Amino acid sequence: MIIIQDTFVCKPGNASRVAKMFKEAMASDPHLVNVMTDVTGQYNRVVIVSQFNNLSDFEKNWEAMSHPTKEMEESMKKMQGYQEMYVSGAREIFRTW
């Protein structure tokens, strides 16, 4: 099992909006575990946590996004404009034991 953690450092005042966008757009994604915002540490962070059986499944998920279904296209529409709401980001991949 692997855990994917995507962290976005948002522009001030945008973290809650970005978190809401992700929560709504990814509501039907079976891999989504949590959408979180910071309480301590660096300000204005949104963390998206997803879970996959292995890296191969994660890669297949990315490939599927290049040929989106109608449902995926609707999710992508909900995310329009989020790129302007954050300044940086990072992805970490963890293996569970």
Predicted regions: what is each one?
Residues M1-E74, K78-W97:
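Short S/T/G/P-rich N-terminal loop/turn motif that feeds into the first structured element of a domain
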